[in-house]
A protein has these predicted regions:
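N-terminal secretory signal peptides
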Residues: 1-16, 27
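Bacterial N-terminal signal peptides
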Residues: 26-32
Length: 240
């Protein structure tokens, strides 16, 4: 008895009689059930830190926020030094920096199709509230990031601190301004673009230079983003 036979019965026999149901049930009982762990990726052993880009969060509303990281132990290589297979990533979001008050946690597979990046969207969070979050994969743990939700739609907060940035060109200068931005402890940061530039190496490279030619392919874009996101000051403001 096949699954298709059951489907045909539902379509053409006007539903299942008790006799047919028992016959199909007996047949289907011989099909092995998949373990709930069947799709889980095996633990991965890293030889260097896979969280080379740190962590980031964004796009909040009053009850949710998006958490991000990417596994890339060799960030400036195609594929980021990762295997062409899914790798399991655990995540936690807590009300304290020591993670004694974890409010949500889970696990997800980081896949090669998405460059082994993960996007988590925990919901049912408190409005106008700070949280800490982190990721784990294999024996590696990411830096801790801070994030916050928006005030409730009908709220009138006394104050909110915003920071605004744009046009960060890796070749044109260092990102040390983000040190001061993080020290100012903004509630939210708006990046208006451009986040990266596609130019070939050396066009503005008086301070430091892009890697490779003008970017066109997906691998080239990922490597260019890796150059930018490898900057520790940029990582710090993303995590602040």
């Amino acid at each position: 008895m096949k699954i298709d036979d059951l489907s045909n019965a539902l379509r053409h026999e006007g539903g299942l009689s008790r006799r047919l149901f028992l016959a199909y049930a007996a047949s289907l009982s011989s099909i092995p059930l998949l373990s709930r762990y069947a799709s889980a990726a095996p633990p991965h052993v890293f030889t260097s830190d896979p969280f080379s880009f740190g962590v980031a969060s964004g796009d909040p509303d009053h009850e949710s926020v998006i958490l991000w990281t990417r596994l890339a132990p060799k960030p400036l290589e195609p594929g980021g030094g990762m295997p062409k297979a899914p790798v399991e990533v655990h995540w936690e979001i807590a009300e304290d920096n020591s993670f004694k008050k974890i409010v949500q946690s889970g696990k997800v597979n980081a896949t090669p199709e998405l460059g082994h990046s993960v996007h988590i969207e925990p919901r049912d969070l408190k409005p106008d509230h700070w949280y800490s979050y982190r990721f784990k994969s294999g024996d590696a743990t990411s830096p801790v990031g801070r994030t916050r939700t928006l005030p409730a739609p009908d709220a009138s907060p006394d104050k909110l601190r915003f920071a605004v940035t744009s046009c960060q060109n890796f070749e044109a200068g260092l990102f040390t301004a983000y040190q001061q931005m993080a020290a100012d402890k903004p509630d939210f940061v708006f990046h208006l673009g451009d986040y990266i530039y596609e130019y070939a190496s050396g066009r503005n490279g008086k301070i430091r230079t892009h890697q490779g030619p003008e970017i066109e392919s997906l691998d080239q874009y990922r490597i260019r983003y890796a150059q930018y996101k490898g900057d520790k000051d940029l990582q710090a403001i993303h995590a602040a």
